[in-house]
Amino acid sequence: MFYRISSIIAALLLSLSTFAASIETDRPWYLAGEAMKVSVTTDNALIAYAELCDTRTLAAGVVISLQGGKGTSTIELPSYLHSGYYVLSVYTRDNANVSRRLVAVVNPLHKSEDDDIEWVPVTDTDTQSYSATIDGESLSTADMADEKAVDVRETEGHIIKAHVKNVYNGTTYRANQIRPSVSIVGKQIHYFEGKMLNDTIAIFHTYGIHGKQPLVLSAATHTGVSLPIEMISPFASLLPKKLPRLVFHYKRNEVEARSLDMQRHQIAIAPASSEPQLGSYHDAEAEDGVPLDYDDTVFGAKPDLTYNLDEYRQFLTIGEVLTEYVNCVRRIKNNGVAQLTVRSVDESYVFTWPAMVLIDGMPVIDVDRLLNYDARRIHYINIYGNQYTFGNGVYRGILSFVTRSGRLTNYPTEPNVQYLVYEFPELNEK
């Protein structure tokens, strides 16, 4: 009890300690649609959050990984932003204090009723464009509409939260009946089983994941029901009560040149028509997918058995493959829920201890849907025969199906799960 009380006191002291972060941006002003590089320096943190807001809404944000108290990342400014000042706020999850600065954004291509800018031409040929304000450029806590809440400290990596609808089809499920998970879609296993903080809020402690990744959020009950789940924004959305008017001294040729560069940048970052999308591959695209070699530094173990289905194209469904080709997997029913069990060659079946079943990293809730899936779309079946623990879940083995694309090639969508592309913190080298 003493240890627990001491831990709580220590956490409170950390949350109340002084938070100081220096913020640097790579430019004194920005065009809507440009990339804004943000550099943060602070102490005692692994993850920092940078968000850009006007008085109405969150405009953009980024999660920054810190190495030695320093980190740099990029905020892609939407091309539709109105002209005016925005407030750039930087904070950590476990501290109520926030560092802020004003950022000038101009949009010469689109006028908006929200514009709060005075355009002043620069006549001196040696002077570059610059921003100014009559009201001053400092912001205090009193200028903000809301105070930042204090949350749990991120000690290992980025924390994700999600809301689970625990009342479904007339049945109410409690926290101990719900298994929330987040998984990265791809050819390697990045699976995180979460914890229910209460009956509706799930929390996930992720680590080792960086950059833009396709992921799947799911919440399954002990009876195999897939509950609706939705990610909670990682940003606090700290809105200012008011912002000063932007006085922008502009040099026409400089703004025009930057505008052309911005438009080229927007074309470069726009998703290509052939960019892989979850579950939307055509057959030809699926066949063209080049599988990545398994990386044992990711999961920590290589599969005990690997089946390459290039050698067995005669099977039409996964069920046929498991029956005729893979001898160490069996379908069982546990409390009316279909499950798959895995055994080693020299072991008997453990009928009541199911395996973790994944397809392209996504947990399979409906096993029968998987068994009816087109086996010709599967490239590898990887089988891990040991006991594995994910969060509060314990599994006897892992059965991992890898499609040729690694992007859930035409796999029937699991009901109520959330598919999205998420920006994890970029890896910053020391």
Question: Model-found features: residue ranges?
Answer:
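Bacterial Sec-dependent N-terminal signal peptides
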Residues: 1-24
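Contiguous segments within soluble domain cores/interaction surfaces
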Residues: 21, 29-66
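Extracytoplasmic beta-strand/coil segments of soluble accessory domains associated
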Residues: 320-357, 390-391, 396-406
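Periplasmic plug
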Residues: 340-384, 414
